[in-house]
Amino acid sequence: MSRKSKKIKKKVFKDSKYDSQVIAKFVNRMMYDGKKSISEAIVYNSIDLLAEKTEEVDKVAAFSKALDNVKPLVEVRSRRVGGATYQVPVEVREERREALAMKWIIAAARKASGKSMQEKLGNELVNSYNSTGVAFKKREDTHRMAEANRAFTHYRW
């Protein structure tokens, strides 16, 4: 029996503009030093850019599609068995899928050079919507790693 107590999940409130919990989480993940208003402005402007470039009417649906295209289905985890460490492919829980997708999109946008953060994030969201870009490549690499190590699936825990 585990001695560690379970982590209590924080309730994330819906964001004010789109009334979406997912966008609120994204805003929180974008935030630096508690500056939420700046983070909100960046995210909202980049969602507007996404809707404009993809000609999608529903902005929340466009954002959700961009996020869904980056969500990984499987990932590899290290498992030590008798002195050897194996990369064991495991299915990813829905909450972690969402968190990883957000993390990868934001990291890709921050890594891009030039332009404002709104433009960089907007472009990365457009790329994710179209199943291209750095964040989507990260997802594909993760899936490729899991596929390569499929032989070790029996080591799941």
Swiss-Prot record:
Keywords: Ribonucleoprotein, Ribosomal protein, RNA-binding, rRNA-binding, tRNA-binding. GO terms for molecular function: rRNA binding; structural constituent of ribosome; tRNA binding. It comes from the Bacteria. GO terms for cellular component: small ribosomal subunit. Coiled coil: none annotated. GO terms for biological process: translation. Pfam families: Ribosomal_S7 (PF00177). Belongs to the universal ribosomal protein uS7 family. One of the primary rRNA binding proteins, it binds directly to 16S rRNA where it nucleates assembly of the head domain of the 30S subunit. Is located at the subunit interface close to the decoding center, probably blocks exit of the E-site tRNA. Part of the 30S ribosomal subunit. Contacts proteins S9 and S11. This is Small ribosomal subunit protein uS7. It comes from Borrelia turicatae (strain 91E135). The lineage of its organism: Bacteria, Pseudomonadati, Spirochaetota, Spirochaetia, Spirochaetales.
